[in-house]
Design a protein with these regions (language model features):
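Hydrophobic transmembrane alpha-helices and their immediate loop junctions
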Residues: 1-235
Length: 235
């Protein structure tokens, strides 16, 4: 079930209450009124339509005349009943397009890379022995500043087994001795996994437009993300 505050599945963010309410409302309106439009198209009377309130949830409904629709051909019945799910699938593609061409580019403009978030440590490897508490953000590796994945890859490119290294994080510095890479014995390995790019608000954008802009862009992007997920789930 797609419910606020619950981890739906690994890899998906937690759904906020406001995103849930808005996503359900928008998708319900698209779904139900598509039934109504197709009913009118095939001259089936719509007995009632409107909005309903289920606790905090605002929903939409359309009620075609069952007697009239039962007299129509199977093709017409199928068209009317499938209009809602089909519309949800189509608008799902629209939401993907909005994310691809609008909200993701906006996120790239209002945020800047600011280190690598580590969410996992591998057993019996150097970083685990430091007792570093995950998650943590790597922002320095020896003399290299780490802003993104390329920085981290370049900083560890020449690391050999047995090399000493200083890993700078938001939770302090850790001194380690590189282990042997399990996939390439000539390469050093520190034993971190499950990376994510950490982001910080773009100070130029913040100073020009205000500190509310980056979180607002994130919020809007997540709305379209959940509209897409729920649309295809319903469709």
């Amino acid at each position: 079930p797609v419910l606020p505050g619950i981890k739906v599945m690994p890899g998906l963010p937690v759904l906020s209450f406001m995103h849930w309410i808005l996503a359900i409302l928008i998708i319900a309106v698209i779904h139900e009124f598509s039934h109504g439009i197709y009913a009118r198209l095939y001259k089936v009377k719509v007995k009632s339509s409107g909005f309903a309130l289920f606790g905090p949830i605002l929903a939409a409904f359309v009620e075609p005349d069952e007697k009239q629709i039962s007299k129509k051909s199977k093709k017409v019945q199928l068209a009317v009943f499938s209009a809602g799910p089909f519309s949800n699938i189509l608008t799902g593609f629209l939401f993907i397009a909005v994310m691809t061409f609008i909200t993701l580019p906006l996120q790239a403009a209002v945020f800047v890379p600011d280190g690598i978030t580590v969410n996992g440590l591998l057993d019996d490897y150097p970083m685990q022995s430091t007792n570093a508490e995950i998650p943590f953000i790597i922002n320095q590796f020896n003399d290299h500043e780490i802003k993104d994945f390329n920085d981290f890859s370049n900083a560890t490119l020449d690391l050999k087994p047995g090399d000493n290294a200083i890993v700078g994080t938001n939770k302090g510095e850790f001194s380690i001795v590189a282990a042997q890479n399990p996939e390439n014995s000539s390469k050093g390995f520190i034993g971190v996994s499950n990376f994510a790019l950490n982001r910080a608000p773009n100070e130029e954008i913040v100073s020009k437009y205000g500190s509310f802009v980056p979180p607002a862009v994130d919020w809007i992007h997540m709305l379209f993300f959940w509209l897409w997920v729920v649309s295809w789930g319903v469709g």
